[in-house]
């Protein structure tokens, strides 16, 4: 079971590396890692389990965050209360194959399980993306995402490219927003 102590923090060089593509069929080790990362997200979103194990809630966890430099991220974006998740999958070798010109940012900024401090500011992202990835069975998927799920996937893909969310924040004026950028509440 992945715990907070297993998640590496900013300053660890693995977080700044470009992760290696994953080959199929998955090794037993990679299959276990995928399952463990998704279990962490499920546990982190369950208030009882999260409190018991002192887990910070997360909607995404990339392999580099557990010190494994591979192109694999678990994503679990919850749906409205009592409904199925909006997005739940382990995305392997993901690629954004198209995106909107329209940018968006979360009003409250972004956070990260590998960053133990608040970094205020807007993180400009594409509002809509088309994502191609493989699941744990090697099946290719092409999905269109917008708003929050699109932002989550871009954050996770950044981890696979050695980029942290605060790299995107305007250093001079963290809350500067182009007129046409959507601010998502």
UniProtKB/Swiss-Prot annotation:
A single GO molecular function term of this UniProt record: metal ion binding
Cofactor: how bound: Binds 1 Fe(2+) ion.
A Pfam family recorded for this sequence: Pep_deformylase
Residues spanning the signal sequence: none
UniProt enzyme class: hydrolase
Keyword Cell membrane part of the UniProt annotation: no
Active-site positions on this chain: 156
Record SUPFAM superfamilies: Peptide deformylase (SSF56420)
Keyword vocabulary terms for this entry: Hydrolase, Iron, Metal-binding, Protein biosynthesis
GO process terms (BP): co-translational protein modification; translation
Needed co-factor(s): Fe(2+)
Annotated EC: 3.5.1.88
Gene3D superfamilies in UniProt: Peptide deformylase (3.90.45.10)
Catalytic reaction equation(s): N-terminal N-formyl-L-methionyl-[peptide] + H2O = N-terminal L-methionyl-[peptide] + formate
Keyword Protein biosynthesis in record: yes
UniProt binding sites for Fe cation: 112, 155, 159
HAMAP family, alphabetized: Pep_deformylase (MF_00163)
Family: Belongs to the polypeptide deformylase family.
PANTHER family on file: PEPTIDE DEFORMYLASE, PEPTIDE DEFORMYLASE 2
Function: Removes the formyl group from the N-terminal Met of newly synthesized proteins. Requires at least a dipeptide for an efficient rate of reaction. N-terminal L-methionine is a prerequisite for activity but the enzyme has broad specificity at other positions.
Protein name: Peptide deformylase
Annotated organism of origin: Latilactobacillus sakei subsp. sakei (strain 23K)
Gene, per the UniProt record: def
